[in-house]
Amino acid sequence: MNILPENTIFVVLSFEGPDAYSMAGGLGARITYLTQTLASMGFEVHHIFIGDPHMSKVEAREEGRLTLHRWCQWISEYHPNGVYDGEEGKLYDFNESVPPFVVHGLAAPAISQGKLIAVLGEEWHTAEAISRISDLLHYEGLRNKAVMFWNTNNTYGFERINWARLSYAITITTVSKYMKHIMRNWGINPLVIPNGIPKEILGEVDEAHVMRLKGLIDTDFIVSKVARWHPDKGWKPAVEAMGRLRSTGKKCVLLARGGIEPYGGKILKRAQSIGLKVRDVCIQRRPLDEDSNAIGEDAFEPYFEALSHAGTGDILNLLFPIPHSFLKVIYRASDVVLANSLHEPFGLVDLEAMATGAVVFTGCSGEDYAMHLVNSIVLDSFNAEEVKFYIENLQAHDEEKKGIQAAARETAKQFTWDKVVRSLLRKLEYQTEVQQRALT
């Protein structure tokens, strides 16, 4: 069966979503791009998520093809600090109320019109709900008219999942071969459907912005790193590599954007203990388009001002949210983007940086797309000496660097959301055939 807008309706379940209240990390962005892409292809899509309590319960977007269903708003009213504030209460309500709504309010009417229902769940929070939806569809005699995928991007919450029940009822997917092998240890053999990046990231970066950023940083070599302050994210080898480069007389600056995690203080103290000068960089006024990704001189001016007032340092600690539009400028201006995580289920930051033509240093876990010295530098260890070696190697081999930059951009083009969704559709079609054969 071909899955087409005329014969299929999508129902997507997640905790995170497109609202600022609902956006806590990469999942919010992933699910927003996924639903938007499906809708842009003509599909009717219903996205059920923990929404902002002060926004409308139901909202139509993408010319009516995408319907947002903001769930648990009555609970979120008492928990203003985002999607995971009051998590357990929201989870209970989600599990109790979403399944009957999906089956009776969305699936049954669509199936009565001869349509297929594709239900997609994201992360451990939706594992129970999607299992209950399957049970209820079966009870109503409708299960054979639905294809159901549940996806995980990480191992968070695995201990709370009833794997036997979930894998019996639902097709399980994940985002990389690395995650597939991890999940085999749990007795699960998932399908692999990669993550994606929006096409807009592939747009050209204004070289005037890039040159201005470079001119504000007094160095011969710019390294950037954007990640949570966490031991697995490779901050320690990153700062120690900077220290070793400095000790050889090389002039390098690390642009560091972490989170609010206390581990950041430990890393910055470590940097200072090996002789690195750390400068905190704050913006003095709010950007005009902070909540959008608008590109313009005025929108970027607060960031340029902040960097111009930072003074000289070996590490510039960026203490402000950075929109994708300005991140692209940082990546493009960087000689190296460090994405050297010990455990990286997919590596979305890596791909976003590669889309700008940056040379990315990846880890060697979930970055299936990374090819050493072809489109990136794939690090084999968590060793600062390896980071230092390849930085020096790039400085000495400019033609090789240019080749990596060109290949990186071409690689990123293969992972735009429209291509990822095509892969998803083919796997849904395959699973639909498997289900139909099982019934005959």
Regions found by a protein language model. Name each.
Residues 2-10, 37-117, 264, 278-314:
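A conserved catalytic-core segment of Leloir-type glycosyltransferases
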Residues 178, 196:
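Carbohydrate-associated surface elements
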Residues 212-233, 239-242, 254-258:
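Conserved donor-binding/catalytic core segment of Leloir-type glycosyltransferases
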Residues 329-334:
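Short alpha-helical donor nucleotide-sugar binding micro-motif in glycosyltransferases
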Residues 342:
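Aromatic "clamp/platform" in nucleotide-sugar-dependent glycosyltransferases that forms part
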Residues 358-363:
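Short hydrophobic beta-strand element within catalytic cores of glycosyltransferases
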Residues 373, 377-384, 393-398:
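Conserved acidic donor-binding segment of nucleotide-sugar-dependent glycosyltransferases
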